[in-house]
C-alpha cells in the first residue's frame, strides 16, 4: 500500500480519455508533500537530461547540477570516460566543486584537503596512515548513473535503473532524424532563471500550442498551426509543425521544408529543433521545491563564431520569447492558489488532435497518475 495521503491519490486511468479530461488538482502544484513524493518516485528514479555532450567533451571538463536538493558533479576523466558523482566529500559532507570549468587532475575538498581522482577513487586523505582501520574503499566518491544519449548527457540516481533508451524508446533516432547535426552542436547562450513555478506547471505550458497565438505573436507568425501535430510516444512526445519565414522571429529562405520539432522528455526536459539549420534550444528543468524550479534555457548552434543573424535570434529569445513563457507560468502558479480557481481546469483536447489541442497535457497527467496511484 502507498503511504500517500488520500488527497494525493489519483486513479490509474486519470486523464486516459483526453477529450473528457480535467487537469490534476491545484494542490499537486503547490503542496510540498506532493513534491516530496515526486522527489523519491520521479526524480530519484528517472533519467534526467542535464547537459549537451559538447560541454564535457575534453579531459578534465566538469559541470555541476542541482536537482531536488542534490548536487551532482559530472567530470570527464583523463581516460576520456565521463562519470557522475554526488558532489559531496565522504569525510564530513562538504561539497567538492561548484559551477563548471576545468578540474585539476585530482579533486581536492576545500575543507580538509581530501583528494580524489577523477574516477572517484581516493587519492589521499591526510593522516590516514595514523588512523586505525582506515578503509580507502569506503572513502570513494559515490557514483551516479550516467549515459550519453542522442548528443546529450543524462543522469539517474537509481543505481539499478535500466538504460535511457528503455525509458525513452525511439527518442534518440527521432532526434537524430530531426537534427542530424545534434552531435556537432555547441552552447552559444544560456539563460538561467529561478522560476517561481512548479515544474509540472512549466511542462503543462510546453505541452500545448493553444496559447501560442495569444501569448507568442512572434513565434505564431512563423509556425503554421494548421500544419502542426502533437504525437504521444510513452515517456516522450513530439510537437511537429511546418514553418514559414518571419521578420519577427525565424528568418530563412522561402520554399524550404523548414519545420519545428519540439520533444518533451519525461519528466522535465524539452528539446527544440528550430527551422534554422544547425540550431537547437533546450529547456532543462531542475526542481527546487513545490513552487520553485531552476531552469537553464540553452541555445546551441553548430558554429562557434556566431553570425549577426544568430546573435539577433539569441536576443529575441532572451528579450521576447523566453519572458513571454516565464510570465505565463508565474501567473498560473499564483492563480492556482486563488479562491476563484475551481481546483481543476478543463483540458481543451479536440477529437482531431489539432495544432491547438491540449491532449499532450492529458497524456502527461496520465503519466503522473501512475506515480500518484494508491
UniProtKB/Swiss-Prot annotation:
Any stretches that span the bilayer, and where are they? none
Indicate which residues the UniProt annotation says bind Fe cation.
211, 216, 325
Which InterPro entries does the record associate with it? Carnitine_monoox_A, Rieske_2Fe-2S, Rieske_2Fe-2S_sf, Ring-hydroxy_dOase_2Fe2S_BS, Ring_hydroxy_dOase_asu_C_dom, Rng_hydr_dOase-A
What processes does the entry annotate via GO biological process terms? carnitine metabolic process
Ligand binding ([2Fe-2S] cluster): 89, 91, 109, 112
Recorded metabolic or biological pathway in which this protein acts:
Amine and polyamine metabolism; carnitine metabolism
Recorded family membership: Belongs to the bacterial ring-hydroxylating dioxygenase alpha subunit family. CntA subfamily.
Mind telling me which HAMAP family this protein's record contains? Answer: Carnitine_monoox_A (MF_02097)
* Assembly behavior: Composed of an oxygenase subunit (yeaW) and a reductase subunit (yeaX).
Annotated protein name in UniProt: Carnitine monooxygenase oxygenase subunit
Species of origin: Escherichia coli (strain K12)
Gene for this protein? Answer: yeaW
Amino acid at each position: 500500500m502507498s503511504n500517500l495521503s488520500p488527497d494525493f491519490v489519483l486513479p490509474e486511468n486519470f486523464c486516459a480519455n483526453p477529450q473528457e479530461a480535467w487537469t490534476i488538482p491545484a494542490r499537486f502544484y503547490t503542496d510540498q508533500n506532493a513534491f516530496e513524493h515526486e522527489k523519491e518516485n520521479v526524480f530519484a528514479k528517472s533519467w534526467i537530461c542535464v547537459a549537451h555532450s559538447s560541454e564535457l567533451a575534453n579531459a578534465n571538463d566538469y559541470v555541476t547540477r542541482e536537482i531536488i536538493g542534490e548536487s551532482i558533479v559530472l567530470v570527464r576523466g583523463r581516460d576520456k570516460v565521463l562519470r557522475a558523482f554526488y558532489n559531496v566529500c565522504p569525510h564530513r559532507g562538504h561539497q567538492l566543486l561548484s559551477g563548471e570549468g576545468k578540474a585539476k587532475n585530482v579533486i581536492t575538498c576545500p575543507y580538509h584537503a581530501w583528494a580524489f581522482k577523477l574516477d572517484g577513487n581516493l587519492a589521499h586523505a591526510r593522516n590516514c596512515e595514523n588512523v586505525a582501520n582506515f578503509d580507502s574503499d569506503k572513502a570513494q566518491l559515490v557514483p551516479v548513473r550516467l549515459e550519453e544519449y542522442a548528443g546529450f548527457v543524462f543522469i539517474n540516481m537509481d543505481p539499478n535503473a535500466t538504460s535511457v533508451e528503455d525509458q525513452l524508446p525511439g527518442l534518440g533516432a527521432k532526434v537524430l532524424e530531426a537534427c542530424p547535426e545534434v552531435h556537432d552542436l555547441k552552447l552559444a547562450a544560456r539563460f538561467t532563471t529561478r522560476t517561481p513555478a512548479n515544474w509540472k506547471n512549466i511542462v503543462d505550458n510546453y505541452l500545448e500550442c493553444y496559447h501560442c497565438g495569444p501569448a507568442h505573436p512572434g513565434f505564431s507568425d512563423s509556425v503554421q498551426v494548421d500544419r502542426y501535430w502533437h504525437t504521444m510516444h510513452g515517456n516522450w512526445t513530439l510537437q511537429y509543425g511546418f514553418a514559414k519565414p518571419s521578420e519577427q522571429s525565424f528568418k530563412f529562405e522561402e520554399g524550404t521544408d523548414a519545420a519545428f520539432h519540439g520533444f518533451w522528455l519525461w519528466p522535465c526536459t524539452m528539446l527544440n529543433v528550430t527551422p534554422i539549420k544547425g540550431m537547437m534550444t533546450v529547456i532543462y528543468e531542475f526542481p527546487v521545491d513545490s513552487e520553485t524550479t531552476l531552469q537553464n534555457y540553452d541555445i546551441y548552434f553548430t558554429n562557434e563564431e556566431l553570425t549577426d543573424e544568430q546573435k539577433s535570434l539569441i536576443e529575441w529569445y532572451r528579450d521576447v520569447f523566453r519572458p513571454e513563457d516565464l510570465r505565463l507560468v508565474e501567473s498560473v502558479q499564483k492563480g492556482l492558489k486563488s479562491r476563484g480557481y475551481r481546483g481543476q481546469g478543463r483540458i481543451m483536447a479536440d477529437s482531431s488532435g489539432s495544432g491547438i489541442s491540449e491532449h499532450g497535457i492529458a497524456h502527461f497527467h496520465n503519466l503522473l497518475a501512475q506515480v500518484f496511484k494508491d
